[in-house]
């Protein structure tokens, strides 16, 4: 479980921000979203493959040289 200690004279909003950052870093929010509803194994594979293809296209797009302007 993620805990934070309140520092002396620390505003509540700052403590909440630190807590949110901590649980985001732990991956708790992502896991909660994944477990919210059951996803078939085939759907998981399909989603992961689509994400991999998207990453590949993004990497290739950034490596391409710009076209020459005449």
Curated annotation (Swiss-Prot):
<comment type="similarity">
    <text>Belongs to the bacterial ribosomal protein bS21 family.</text>
</comment>
<dbReference type="Pfam" id="PF01165">
    <property type="entry name" value="Ribosomal_S21"/>
</dbReference>
<keyword id="KW-0689">Ribosomal protein</keyword>
<dbReference type="GO" id="GO:0003735">
    <property type="term" value="F:structural constituent of ribosome"/>
</dbReference>
<dbReference type="InterPro" id="IPR038380">
    <property type="entry name" value="Ribosomal_bS21_sf"/>
</dbReference>
<keyword id="KW-0687">Ribonucleoprotein</keyword>
<dbReference type="GO" id="GO:1990904">
    <property type="term" value="C:ribonucleoprotein complex"/>
</dbReference>
<protein>
    <recommendedName>
        <fullName>Small ribosomal subunit protein bS21A</fullName>
    </recommendedName>
</protein>
<dbReference type="GO" id="GO:0006412">
    <property type="term" value="P:translation"/>
</dbReference>
<dbReference type="InterPro" id="IPR001911">
    <property type="entry name" value="Ribosomal_bS21"/>
</dbReference>
<dbReference type="GO" id="GO:0005840">
    <property type="term" value="C:ribosome"/>
</dbReference>
């Amino acid at each position: 479980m993620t805990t934070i200690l309140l520092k002396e004279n620390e505003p509540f909003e700052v403590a909440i921000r630190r807590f949110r950052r901590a649980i985001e870093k732990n991956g708790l929010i992502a896991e909660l979203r994944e477990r919210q509803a059951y996803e078939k194994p085939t759907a998981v594979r399909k989603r992961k493959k689509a994400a991999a293809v998207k990453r590949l296209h993004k990497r290739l797009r950034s490596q391409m040289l710009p076209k020459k302007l005449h």
